[in-house]
């Protein structure tokens, strides 16, 4: 029998959650991570599945995700413990044929359930599937320290925040030319914040929740993690710069335009115009 804990997707989730914990982005049970799979990914592991998979209805139907498997982190689970007991902290779920709910095929032992942010994840997956023609498969939410800090001191405006991050590190415009979407503060774990996040995910692969954290999307676990890591590094630089009295020189608009041309990306126009 093939052991699902040795599969590429379980091992990938272990690495991503462990790395995020070590970064300091996921204290206690903070953060959540979902990866969209294909049936072929789980085909070898049916012997590992629960004999009677639990069914959980969704608060709103997701027909675009019908019959789609995911691996997800659990509600109330600590990222630091995923590596110690993957089956207790992760779960493979599969959305049913009409998108009204899902079965827990593997993991989430002892009656555990997926992350409370699953509505936000699933709604964001739907939008990123449409925005990237199915390329994006990962939604990651974490409490990246310096990005959160900046939401207290910068105007919480997409163009302003994006431009500052682009200026904080040269690679940022290349990595996220589509900029950073920003929500107003909202209660987490609700359909409302999920819908608002998904709306921003139509236009941006990064979405900030002020005073809380960040959502990132990407085609692989490495890409989604790297996207957040890049933005967080720029935020760390900016926190240091602001604490030293602010910028005396920075990357100019003309230089940002040249950077976009060199790497074949189209920068977010509203951020470039500032």
UniProtKB/Swiss-Prot annotation:
The lineage of its organism: Bacteria, Pseudomonadati, Pseudomonadota, Gammaproteobacteria, Enterobacterales. The keyword Coiled coil does not apply. Its main location: cytoplasm. Its EC number is 4.1.2.19. It is found in: Cytoplasm. It catalyses: L-rhamnulose 1-phosphate = (S)-lactaldehyde + dihydroxyacetone phosphate. It comes from Shigella flexneri. The active site is at residue 117. Zn(2+) binds at residues 141, 143, 212. This is Rhamnulose-1-phosphate aldolase. Catalyzes the reversible cleavage of L-rhamnulose-1-phosphate to dihydroxyacetone phosphate (DHAP) and L-lactaldehyde. Homotetramer. Its cofactor is Zn(2+). SUPFAM superfamilies: AraD/HMP-PK domain-like (SSF53639). One of its GO terms (biological process) is pentose catabolic process. Belongs to the aldolase class II family. RhaD subfamily. Keywords: Cytoplasm, Lyase, Metal-binding, Rhamnose metabolism, Zinc. It is an enzyme of class 4 (lyase). InterPro entries: Aldolase_class_II_sugar_metab, Aldolase_II/adducin_N, Aldolase_II/adducin_N_sf, Rhamnulose-1-P_Aldolase. Pathway: Carbohydrate degradation; L-rhamnose degradation; glycerone phosphate from L-rhamnose: step 3/3. GO terms for molecular function: metal ion binding; rhamnulose-1-phosphate aldolase activity. The gene is rhaD.
């Amino acid at each position: 029998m093939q052991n699902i804990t040795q599969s590429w997707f379980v091992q990938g989730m272990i690495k991503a959650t462990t790395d995020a914990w070590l970064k300091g982005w996921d204290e206690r049970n903070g953060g959540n991570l979902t990866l969209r799979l294909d049936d072929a990914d789980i085909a070898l592991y049916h012997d590992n599945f629960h004999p009677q998979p639990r069914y959980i209805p969704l608060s709103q139907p997701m027909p675009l995700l019908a019959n789609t498997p995911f691996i997800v982190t659990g509600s109330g689970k600590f990222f630091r413990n995923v590596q110690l007991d993957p089956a207790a902290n992760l779960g493979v779920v599969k959305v049913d044929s009409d998108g009204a709910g899902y079965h827990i095929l593997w993991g989430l032992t002892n009656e555990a359930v997926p992350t409370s942010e699953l509505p936000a994840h699933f709604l964001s997956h739907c939008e990123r599937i449409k925005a990237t023609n199915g390329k994006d498969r990962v939604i990651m939410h974490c409490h990246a320290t310096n990005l959160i800090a900046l939401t207290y001191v910068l105007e919480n405006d997409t163009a302003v925040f994006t431009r500052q991050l682009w200026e904080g590190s040269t690679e940022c415009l290349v990595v996220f030319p589509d900029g950073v979407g920003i929500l107003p503060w909202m209660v987490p774990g609700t359909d409302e914040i999920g819908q608002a996040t998904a709306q921003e995910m139509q236009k941006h692969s990064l979405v900030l929740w002020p005073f809380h954290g960040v959502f990132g999307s990407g085609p692989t676990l490495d890409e989604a993690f790297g996207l957040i890591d890049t933005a967080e590094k720029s935020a760390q630089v900016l926190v240091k710069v602001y604490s030293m009295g602010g910028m005396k020189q920075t990357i100019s608009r003309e230089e940002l335009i040249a950077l976009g041309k060199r790497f074949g990306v189209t920068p977010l126009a509203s951020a470039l115009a500032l």
